[in-house]
Amino acid sequence: MDDNKSKALAAALSQIEKQFGKGSIMRMGDADIGEDLQVVSTGSLGLDIALGVGGLPRGRIIEIYGPESSGKTTLTLSAIAEMQKLGGVAAFIDADDALDPQYASKLGVNVPELLISQPDTGEQALEIADMLVRSGSVDIVVVDSVAALTPRAEIEGEMGDSHMGLQARLMSQALRKLTGNIKRTNTLVIFINQIRMKIGVMFGNPETTTGGNALKFYSSVRLDIRRTGAIKKGDEVIGSETKVKVIKNKVAPPFKQAEFDIMYGEGISRLGEIIELGTNLKLVEKSGAWYSYNGEKIGQGKENAKEFLRENPAIAAEIEAKIRDNSNVLADSMTAARSEDD
């Protein structure tokens, strides 16, 4: 670049910084830009690996969606618990009015320190979220759920009134405001969403999420969570087998998937994941129903192997460390088949 151009550029950059503040424009090679992405664990070892960066990225919008009772709230409460372990402040905007403090406590959430809001309208919920983000003092904000963000006009109107597209416009406007503040304050914002069926779809995926398309575009990560089976102890159902697909990922390659168990009253089974992922990497040997580690049997059947690791946390930590060291190998094997709607 010649001297005249360099001087003109320097003058323009100086004027921009003077008018809009320091850091409003910078070169990609500057030190501040190259900082490592900060993440918080999801509470699932396999999902952290599938996300490619070790967890959910801060300063971004995350959407978690799936059918009813698929584990959406469990996953977000696990992320809240992980953030609190790091000393972070968490807020839960409960538009569904369905948060169970006792269940949250069982998942490791520090309930007395959790900020909770049960807003009357969608506008109020999103305004509260924006104010919390702008404060810069909250590390994670969860909105549960987008489907329950009812616009004020709909609440104040008659039961049969038509309010076509009102919620979608509300979400679009709110996300335009939120995005910049979320990035500036490095806050992690998670929206839980529900699934609806598109009417008249003959080909392709008839499923869609509520609240219009804005959230799909503004989200850096979109997770599709599904219950794939039941875990039984005799005739009693004690948990559910769960699969999570990374449908969208702006911080790492997408279309990975993770599978884990959600145990009722316990949450995501960390020890179950250690056994499964360890077996996949041949760190844990499986012969018939027996599991072995370093040539020593640790249990017959998965539940007994989990009990062994529960009683021997040092061995569990050792296997987990080896799994993390081989996370690239695991990530390559986690690629999910793309659906027609992805």
Swiss-Prot record:
Pfam families: RecA, RecA_C. PROSITE patterns: RECA_1, RECA_2, RECA_3. One of its GO terms (cellular component) is cytosol. Keywords: ATP-binding, Cytoplasm, DNA damage, DNA recombination, DNA repair, DNA-binding, Nucleotide-binding, SOS response. CDD domains: RecA. One of its GO terms (molecular function) is single-stranded DNA binding. ATP binds at residues 66-73. Belongs to the RecA family. This is Protein RecA. The gene is recA.
